[in-house]
Amino acid sequence: MQELKAYVVEDNATIRENLIGALEELTCVRVVGNSATEDEGLQWLEQNSQDWDMVIVDLFLQRGSGIRLVQRVRRGNASQKIIVFSNYVNASVRKRCAQLGVDAVFDKSTEIDFLVDYCARHCSQVTQEAGT
Protein backbone atom coordinates (compact mmCIF):
# COMPACT_ATOMS: atom_id res chain seq x y z
CA MET A 1 0.00 0.00 0.00
CA GLN A 2 1.27 3.44 -0.89
CA GLU A 3 2.31 5.63 2.04
CA LEU A 4 0.61 8.99 2.56
CA LYS A 5 2.46 11.84 4.25
CA ALA A 6 0.54 13.92 6.78
CA TYR A 7 1.27 17.06 8.74
CA VAL A 8 -0.61 17.62 12.02
CA VAL A 9 -1.37 21.04 13.55
CA GLU A 10 -2.61 20.35 17.10
CA ASP A 11 -1.71 22.20 20.29
CA ASN A 12 -2.64 19.48 22.80
CA ALA A 13 0.41 17.20 23.04
CA THR A 14 -1.56 14.19 24.31
CA ILE A 15 -4.14 14.41 21.53
CA ARG A 16 -1.40 15.01 18.95
CA GLU A 17 0.63 11.95 20.02
CA ASN A 18 -2.45 9.71 20.26
CA LEU A 19 -3.65 10.84 16.83
CA ILE A 20 -0.24 10.27 15.25
CA GLY A 21 0.00 6.82 16.85
CA ALA A 22 -3.47 5.79 15.67
CA LEU A 23 -2.94 7.00 12.11
CA GLU A 24 0.46 5.35 11.76
CA GLU A 25 -0.71 2.08 13.31
CA LEU A 26 -4.07 1.73 11.56
CA THR A 27 -3.53 3.36 8.15
CA CYS A 28 -0.81 3.95 5.56
CA VAL A 29 -0.36 7.51 6.88
CA ARG A 30 3.10 8.55 8.04
CA VAL A 31 3.21 11.84 9.92
CA VAL A 32 6.12 13.85 8.54
CA GLY A 33 5.80 16.77 10.94
CA ASN A 34 3.64 18.54 13.45
CA SER A 35 3.24 21.87 15.18
CA ALA A 36 1.17 23.51 17.89
CA THR A 37 0.70 26.98 16.36
CA GLU A 38 -0.69 28.57 13.21
CA ASP A 39 2.60 30.25 12.25
CA GLU A 40 4.74 27.11 12.69
CA GLY A 41 2.24 25.05 10.73
CA LEU A 42 1.92 27.52 7.90
CA GLN A 43 5.69 27.97 7.67
CA TRP A 44 6.27 24.22 7.35
CA LEU A 45 3.45 23.77 4.84
CA GLU A 46 4.73 26.63 2.67
CA GLN A 47 8.34 25.40 2.77
CA ASN A 48 7.28 21.83 1.98
CA SER A 49 4.34 22.41 -0.36
CA GLN A 50 4.96 19.20 -2.33
CA ASP A 51 5.92 17.05 0.66
CA TRP A 52 2.51 16.32 2.19
CA ASP A 53 -0.61 14.48 1.12
CA MET A 54 -2.85 15.66 3.95
CA VAL A 55 -2.84 18.23 6.71
CA ILE A 56 -4.92 17.68 9.83
CA VAL A 57 -5.72 20.95 11.62
CA ASP A 58 -7.31 21.82 14.97
CA LEU A 59 -9.35 25.03 14.87
CA PHE A 60 -8.22 26.45 18.21
CA LEU A 61 -4.46 26.55 18.77
CA GLN A 62 -2.04 27.85 21.43
CA ARG A 63 -1.23 30.74 19.14
CA GLY A 64 -3.24 31.52 16.09
CA SER A 65 -6.22 29.89 14.46
CA GLY A 66 -6.76 26.74 12.47
CA ILE A 67 -9.32 28.57 10.34
CA ARG A 68 -6.74 31.22 9.38
CA LEU A 69 -4.23 28.48 8.59
CA VAL A 70 -6.78 26.76 6.34
CA GLN A 71 -7.50 30.09 4.61
CA ARG A 72 -3.80 30.72 3.98
CA VAL A 73 -2.43 27.28 3.12
CA ARG A 74 -1.79 26.67 -0.55
CA ARG A 75 -1.95 23.18 -1.95
CA GLY A 76 0.99 22.12 -4.06
CA ASN A 77 -1.31 19.82 -6.03
CA ALA A 78 -5.01 19.04 -6.27
CA SER A 79 -4.77 15.66 -4.53
CA GLN A 80 -3.65 17.15 -1.20
CA LYS A 81 -6.34 16.94 1.49
CA ILE A 82 -7.12 19.48 4.20
CA ILE A 83 -8.85 17.97 7.23
CA VAL A 84 -10.21 19.77 10.29
CA PHE A 85 -10.20 17.84 13.59
CA SER A 86 -11.64 19.90 16.43
CA ASN A 87 -13.75 19.84 19.59
CA TYR A 88 -15.74 22.79 18.25
CA VAL A 89 -17.66 21.32 15.33
CA ASN A 90 -21.23 22.29 14.51
CA ALA A 91 -23.23 22.96 11.36
CA SER A 92 -21.89 26.50 10.91
CA VAL A 93 -18.27 25.36 11.37
CA ARG A 94 -18.79 22.58 8.81
CA LYS A 95 -20.32 25.09 6.38
CA ARG A 96 -17.45 27.58 6.83
CA CYS A 97 -14.87 24.84 6.38
CA ALA A 98 -16.59 23.68 3.18
CA GLN A 99 -16.53 27.28 1.89
CA LEU A 100 -12.77 27.34 2.53
CA GLY A 101 -12.19 24.14 0.58
CA VAL A 102 -11.68 21.80 3.53
CA ASP A 103 -12.08 18.19 2.40
CA ALA A 104 -13.40 16.75 5.68
CA VAL A 105 -14.33 17.88 9.20
CA PHE A 106 -14.30 15.61 12.26
CA ASP A 107 -15.27 16.20 15.88
CA LYS A 108 -12.49 15.12 18.27
CA SER A 109 -14.90 14.04 20.97
CA THR A 110 -17.01 11.69 18.84
CA GLU A 111 -15.48 11.13 15.40
CA ILE A 112 -11.87 9.95 15.72
CA ASP A 113 -12.87 6.56 14.30
CA PHE A 114 -14.39 8.36 11.31
CA LEU A 115 -11.14 10.29 10.81
CA VAL A 116 -9.11 7.06 10.87
CA ASP A 117 -11.60 5.44 8.44
CA TYR A 118 -11.38 8.47 6.14
CA CYS A 119 -7.59 8.22 6.09
CA ALA A 120 -7.70 4.45 5.49
CA ARG A 121 -10.12 4.93 2.56
CA HIS A 122 -7.87 7.63 1.13
CA CYS A 123 -4.92 5.23 1.42
CA SER A 124 -6.85 2.57 -0.52
CA GLN A 125 -7.97 5.06 -3.15
CA VAL A 126 -4.44 6.39 -3.75
CA THR A 127 -3.05 2.85 -3.92
CA GLN A 128 -5.69 1.83 -6.50
CA GLU A 129 -5.02 4.95 -8.57
CA ALA A 130 -1.29 4.20 -8.51
CA GLY A 131 -2.00 0.66 -9.69
CA THR A 132 0.01 -1.01 -6.94
Show which residues each predicted segment covers:
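The feature encodes the CheY-like receiver
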Residues: 62
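Short amphipathic alpha-helix used as the core "switch/output" element in two-component signaling
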Residues: 67-78
